[in-house]
Amino acid sequence: MSYDRAITVFSPDGHLFQVEYAQEAVKKGSTAVGVRGKEIVVLGVEKKSVAKLQDERTVRKICALDENVFMAFAGLTADARIVINRARVECQSHRLTVEDPVTVEYITRYIASLKQRYTQSNGRRPFGISALIVGFDFDGTPRLYQTDPSGTYHAWKANAIGRGAKSVREFLEKHYTDEAIETDDLTIKLVIKALLEVVQSGGKNIELAVMRRDQPLKILNPEEIERYVAEIEKEKEENEKKKQKKTT
């Protein structure tokens, strides 16, 4: 029997191959990074270069689900569009029903449940996306969650998904400290530094979104990102000069 054709059938060694193939599709997607700061949440995405005549505003990997929640994804954009639309409807329904915005965990659990149903239904295939979902609960607590095609989800302080996730995660494990997220600017710089591990052409290929407590989502413009990149490069040069002085 060909176990990789049937979505609902386990292989003898316990694999659901279609779910694993969906996870491989995620690994081919653009790198996305999320970091939870003290008063801020930041998402950064590697921007792929667009065709000369294409309007780059139509190619977005970061989107708002509600006033207090937004997400970035890696994987198949068309699959993500379905998940995003359903999540937005759920956010609106929740607001109408209980007159409060969703918590970040609530909408993450909804998205994870939606993905899980597609791993257990005949005639369907899993969604080929992973998502980083960030925002603030109504008590002002910053949150960061990650979901994958199997329908599992976890809370994180910082995480990465997509093509360069392994090297970016290693960078974050080394450099994520309380001092590194002490201020909003330092948190933003940490995300940019993490992305620069895999993005070759500097700030022009980075998309960045930030949300501060009690403030709406803000997409940073290219000039702001370039300013942060310039500051990071300057800090690197100064650190290298200090190292050279110590060795001499």
Curated annotation (Swiss-Prot):
* Family annotation (Gene3D superfamilies): Glutamine Phosphoribosylpyrophosphate, subunit 1, domain 1
Superkingdom of source: Eukaryota
Query: What are the subcellular locations of this protein?
Result: Cytoplasm; Nucleus
Pfam families given in the database record: Proteasome, Proteasome_A_N
User: Looking at the keywords, is Phosphoprotein present?
Assistant: yes
Q: What is said about its interaction partners and assembly? A: The 26S proteasome consists of a 20S proteasome core and two 19S regulatory subunits. The 20S proteasome core is composed of 28 subunits that are arranged in four stacked rings, resulting in a barrel-shaped structure. The two end rings are each formed by seven alpha subunits, and the two central rings are each formed by seven beta subunits. The catalytic chamber with the active sites is on the inside of the barrel.
What family is this protein classified in?
Belongs to the peptidase T1A family.
- What's this protein's function? The proteasome is a multicatalytic proteinase complex which is characterized by its ability to cleave peptides with Arg, Phe, Tyr, Leu, and Glu adjacent to the leaving group at neutral or slightly basic pH. The proteasome has an ATP-dependent proteolytic activity.
Descriptive protein name: Proteasome subunit alpha type-7-A
The gene name reads psma7-a
